[in-house]
Curated annotation (Swiss-Prot):
Name of the protein in its database record: tRNA pseudouridine synthase B
InterPro entries given in the database record: PsdUridine_synth_cat_dom_sf (IPR020103), PsdUridine_synth_N (IPR002501), PUA-like_sf (IPR015947), PUA_sf (IPR036974), tRNA_psdUridine_synth_TruB (IPR014780), tRNA_sdUridine_synth_fam1_C (IPR015240), TruB_C (IPR032819)
Catalytic activity: uridine(55) in tRNA = pseudouridine(55) in tRNA
Gene this chain is encoded by: truB
Family, per entry: Belongs to the pseudouridine synthase TruB family. Type 1 subfamily.
Catalytic residue list: 47
Annotated EC: 5.4.99.25
GO biological process: mRNA pseudouridine synthesis; tRNA pseudouridine synthesis
Length: 306
């Protein structure tokens, strides 16, 4: 019988460069195995076809993962114009064709039209749930579920390369944006079809692909070297204001009480809390009407002291 490596408490964030061909969950489990971590989760699904930045949260960092899921993101997408696929990407079958002799001017106009605050219908091949099941399970059976359009923001679409029928675009967008659908909508604006042949997430919440690490590189390191690549848990909430509390106020938070706090901040604002010696305590919510802090997500005492 083969003995499995003993799991250990690991706390922090690893910026993974997910390879093509792996689901986000498979990439997560491989990373978790390398670190022998007791608990792990990722922040935002990437399709198996897609590569790039996938922040992996270990241990106490999973408490704050939701704040990164909601962050803006950036992608580099490669489109093939003139062909629609059943999945919106290269993994599906070609189901329709149209003109592919698109001019750069036409493509630029379409990209401009899809920039800004827009509404987007999520694709059937997505992890969104309907009656407890992800939409892609219905799609694989040929069942189409009606989806409501959602408000998203496309901050910028920059054309990195254009040689029809191939186009490469850099997209900066809000959470919940489906690049496959965006590519199809760009083509629809021109009067043709398109599908993705490659997709790479290059940025999320200020983290860039240059900061990430491949599974292969991680496997070639020893445990101490791998651990040195972990970012502290509070990087996930670095965009929130911070405050320092004395030991008594920190104790109050941990006991479910609400220490006094007064700042020029909107009510309900999450605030990063630190001890006087710089340890991250967690997130608290500012209740402006009573000038108090209410605990939202707090680090485990032992992890906070580490």
């Amino acid at each position: 019988m083969t003995n499995k490596p003993a799991k250990r408490p690991v706390n922090g964030v690893l910026l993974l460069d997910k390879p093509e061909g792996l689901s986000s969950n498979t990439a997560l489990q491989k990373t978790r195995h390398l670190f022998r971590a007791e608990k792990a989760g990722h922040t935002g699904v990437l399709d198996p076809l897609a590569t790039g930045l996938l922040p992996v949260c270990f241990g106490e960092a999973t408490k704050f993962a939701q704040y990164l899921i909601n962050a803006d993101k950036a992608y580099t997408a490669t489109l093939k114009l003139g062909e629609a696929s059943s999945t919106g990407d290269a993994e599906g079958e070609i189901v329709a064709t149209a003109r592919a002799d698109i001019s750069l001017a036409e493509f630029q106009t379409a990209c401009q039209a899809l920039t800004g605050n827009i509404r987007q219908v999520p694709p059937m091949f997505s992890a969104l749930k309907h009656e407890g099941k992800p939409l892609y399970e219905y799609a694989r059976k040929g069942i189409v579920i009606e989806r409501k359009a959602r408000d998203i923001t496309v901050y910028a679409i920059d054309i990195a390369e254009f040689d029809a029928p191939k186009a490469v675009i850099d997209v900066r967008c809000s959470k919940g944006t489906y690049i496959r659908t965006l590519s199809e909508d760009i083509a629809k604006h021109i009067g043709t079809f398109a599908h993705l042949t490659a997709l790479r997430r290059t940025e999320t919440a200020g983290f860039t692909i240059a900061q990430s690490h491949t599974l292969e590189a991680l496997a070639n390191l020893d445990e101490t070297e791998r651990d040195s690549l972990l970012l502290p848990c509070d990087v996930l909430v670095a965009h929130f204001p911070q405050t320092v509390l004395n030991d008594y106020a920190v104790h109050m938070l941990r006991c479910g009480q609400r220490p006094r706090f007064e700042e020029d901040l909107p009510s309900d604002t999450p605030v990063r809390v630190y001890t006087e010696n710089g340890r991250f305590v967690g997130l608290a919510e500012y209740q402006k009407e009573i000038c108090r802090l209410k605990a939202l997500r707090l680090m485990n005492t032992a992890a906070s002291a580490a």
